[in-house]
Amino acid sequence: VSYTDCTSGQNYCLCGGNFCGDGKHCEMDGSENKCVDGEGTPKRQTSGPSDFEEFSLDDIEQ
């Protein structure tokens, strides 16, 4: 199941031939598109400090 990147914060989003609104998002399961309550699948957040291990300058100068 995949979702469009329209979120429930938008008033309207196109879901196949249907318009989703009122806090719904478009869910696509391959055979049909339907408007469902809630948010779509979250996008990956931008890289943050937790994505990298800390190292000291001494580790670089080898």
UniProtKB/Swiss-Prot annotation:
GO cellular component: extracellular region
One function term, GO molecular function aspect: serine-type endopeptidase inhibitor activity
Site note Not glycosylated, residues: 41
Post-translational modification: O-linked glycan consists of Fuc-Gal-GalNAc trisaccharide.
Region of interest: Disordered: 37-62
Skewed-composition ranges (Acidic residues): 51-62
Keyword set includes Secreted: yes
UniProt xrefs under SUPFAM superfamilies: Leech antihemostatic proteins
Top-level lineage group: Eukaryota
Annotated glycan sites: 46
Ranges in coiled-coil conformation: none
Family the UniProt entry places it in: Belongs to the protease inhibitor I14 (hirudin) family.
Name of the protein this chain belongs to: Hirullin-P18
Organism of this sequence: Hirudinaria manillensis
InterPro entries named among the record's database cross-references: Hirudin, Hirudin/antistatin, Prot_inh_hirudin
